Amino acid sequence: MKKVALVSPLRTAVGSFNKTLAPLSASELGATVMTACLQQSKLEPSLIDQIYLGNVLQAGNGQNPARQAALKAGIPIDVPETTINTVCGSGLHAVALAYNSILAEQGNIVLAGGMESMSNAPYLLRNARNGYKLGNGELVDSLVADGLTCPINHYHMGITAENVAEKYGISRLEQDEFAYQSQLKAIEAKNKKLFEEQIVPVMIKTKKETISFTEDEHIRGNTTQEKLSQLKPAFKENGTVTAGNASGINDGAAAVLVVSEDKCKEHALKPLAYIKGYSLVGVDPAYMGMGPVKAISTLLKQQGISIDAIDLFEINEAFASQALAVVKELGVSLDKVNVNGGAIAIGHPVGASGARILTTLVHEMVRRSSRYGIASLCIGTGMGIAMLVENALI
């Protein structure tokens, strides 16, 4: 079987809700990181066969946001683009589809990733098309409706996190401690400049100047266990899930060149990792946070590899309760999981997160000379995705 490489995995820094990245659309963020991938790899845009980009909150963004981003990045008009919406798994699914395309000989060089501007998700007037004859109309927040609500069970993703906490016995204290550790690890990584090689500057024009945005701004350096313990339950009376032990609402983008080994050699590209395989699975929507357990187990069985052989995991921290339950069910040491913090600290721009955690994973594997890593996410509506990668430099 063909070897498929990951070349120049890069991301923007993650922006906080309605903060620094808010003036930019998802496609502008996507264009920024795609341009950087091409510049770093020194690959001619005309050599790209196709593009897959995740984007979840598409209301009002116009047709095919992936193509918009590609054209803004200077990709030739004859290169086709596909926008992927697999909720939180979109960015990683986009990379998986790029991998599939190469194995199916539908291309040899594919640009893939994800982008999201949660700050720019619009409000909707659902019944305005036919007019309001009497009474008040309701504004619907598309961010909540399309990004954070289970359409099967008709409740917030936070309730699925409460369901997991109850079923798997994850206490409020455990969740707050996990969230605190996520912040500490992210702060340490930021201070040690461990994210520098994976982050590309986003240039933002203001009335007075042009700002270069290069640091994750969702990380809270002043978080304490005491502050976390004082937060009220966000989704359920007497619940355990709070704003402090859940992921953020964020903006950002990430992308990577997915390339056949032959083309890497032909164009002198430098792979950082090889994709060994991936899995996409379905689970009960009420416990969607457990998707990574099934996805990772399926992937390991498919690849004939023991979980003990995996050196590092990036398991998206949608909520502390589900991340802890996943780790416990898999029997994985926390020392291997999200070693530089996760979405609770760094943030969760939904359509970009899959590509973001893959980018972070690959760079950390290279830094540590780790052989195998797995990136995995739970997915709203009840799914899970996981990808196994191998260090190309050892």
What does each of the following model-derived ranges do?
Residues 1-25, 139, 224-290, 294, ...:
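Condensing-enzyme catalytic core mediating Claisen C-C bond formation in acyl metabolism
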Residues 11-12, 23-27, 31-32, 40, ...:
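N-terminal extracellular/periplasmic Venus flytrap/periplasmic-binding protein-like
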Residues 23-89, 93-110, 114-133, 199-214, ...:
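Conserved beta-ketoacyl condensing-enzyme motif
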Residues 26-42, 65-69, 94-97, 157-164, ...:
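Short, well-ordered amphipathic alpha-helical segments that serve as non-catalytic structural scaffolds
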Residues 55-109, 152-156, 222-248, 329-356, ...:
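Conserved catalytic cysteine-centered active-site region
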Residues 86-116, 165-194, 255-262, 327, ...:
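Active-site-proximal alpha-helical scaffold in enzymes
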Residues 109-163:
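Flexible glycine-/small-residue-enriched beta->alpha junction loops
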Residues 159-162, 195-198, 206, 276-345:
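Active-site pocket-lining segment
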